[in-house]
């Protein structure tokens, strides 16, 4: 039912508006019918390892690079040229992606996201409850629920701060970008100077359309 409604909504948008270009990545959870519809009505640009991108990709396994990561690095390359940039995306997973001042994408890291950590504690243990994310002030949990919140939330904060400190020690004058669905939840807890932008990925998608529409 959801797929049918989704298809109809896309169809209505295309019929009600003049749309010349469209772009598809794994961020949009596309299916075959949607792809066919977009191909018939627009110039469809598919994000893959063959796409024209605004940076040099030095990733050793280009075909396995996540499409959302490629889009985020494209956004950084266009918005902050001639800069060292670390993009931290707080989504289902937490991804770290680094692009150098020479406009070369080096790579980064992937770790479990906020909700994934809560679910893992519940799924892989016998007695720990499944909790919703909660902001906490104390690092020491005085009961089981607070201990889970402390472990998950503070664990991510320590991870991000430690990762940022490492990159700052290796690269001078680095810009730190925080984005993704959980960025607002965690941004105030992170000590390092960070530019937060929840639309960073959307800007990257738009840049790729402009670069590949000709």
Role assignments for model-derived ranges:
Residues 94-99:
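Short beta-strand scaffold segments in enzyme catalytic cores
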